[in-house]
C-alpha cells in the first residue's frame, strides 16, 4: 500500500476568528504567526469582527484583513471562500454551520480547535498543539504567545500619552460582563494614592471623573495598545480582569495583574509576563472547559453571594497591591 501523499504547500491561507470578543482574536494571534512562520511565502488573510481587526494592522504575517458583519458571519465565510479560494483554512469558529462549510469547500482545513481540551491547558497553547498535530505548523512553535505589532510612531505616541510617569499603574475597570466585575476598584485606586491611571470608554471615564485616579483620554484601540506598551517599557503594570484590553496589554509587552473569578486562570490567563489572581480557586461550580455553561455566567447569579460573584470579591485589593511595583527612588 502506498503512503498517503503530502498535501501541497498552501499559497493562500485563511484564518477565521468570529467568536465575537476582542480577547478571542488576541488568543488566536499565535495561530496566525505560527502559520506564517511555517508558510512564509503564502498569502495569509484573516476574517474577523471589528473593532479587533485593527490589531492586525502593520502585522507582517497578515496580507489582508476582512471584516465580518455581526449576525452575518456564515455569509461572510462563504463569500470569502468563494472569492479567494484558500488552499488552507483554520478556524476557531464552528457555529451556524461554519465549520461544515469550510470542510466542504476548502481543500485543507482545521475546523475544531476546541476538541477535548484539558482543564489546565491555556487556550492559545491548545490551538497550537492541535495545529502541530495536524502538521500545518512547526512543532517548535507550540509555545508562541500573543504579540501585537506597533509602529515606531505609535510607540512614541504611547510614551507621550503616559507622560513622565515612572513605573505607571493603569487600571482597566471595564469587565464586559457582570459576572467578571470586580467590586474593589475604588479601594485599590485610593490605596494607590494618586499613582493610578484609569483607561476605558467615555462612559467609564465619566463614572470615574472626580474619583481617586487620573483619567487617560478616550483612546482608539491601537492608541490604548501603545499606552500599554509604554507602561511595559517603564516597568509599570496594567491591572484588570479577564477582558480583551488586558490581553492587548500582555500582547504588547506590559506586565499584567489579572483578576480572575468565573474563568479559570489556568486556561484563560494573560501570559508569562503577568500574574493571574484566581478568586475562590476551589469553586465547585466552575467548569474550566465549558465556562458559558456555569450557573453564574450569563446573569451573574452567584450560588454563594446575593450581591455579586463571590469569586471576584475574593480577590482583595491587598493581593493586587502586593504586585504593584514601587516607583524608583530619584
Question: What are the residue ranges of the model-derived segments?
Answer:
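Active-site donor-nucleotide binding/catalytic segment of nucleotide-sugar enzymes
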Residues: 15, 19, 114-115, 145-209, ...
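Conserved nucleotide-sugar phosphate-binding/catalytic loop shared by glycosyltransferases and other
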Residues: 19, 41-76, 280
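Short amphipathic alpha-helix
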Residues: 25-37, 51-52, 188
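Conserved nucleotide-diphosphate donor binding/catalytic pocket of glycan-assembly enzymes
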Residues: 62-147, 167-172, 263-266
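Donor-binding and catalytic core of enzymes assembling or modifying cell-surface/extracellular glycoconjugates
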Residues: 75, 181-266
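Nucleotide-sugar donor-binding patch of glycosyltransferase catalytic domains
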Residues: 117, 211, 251-330
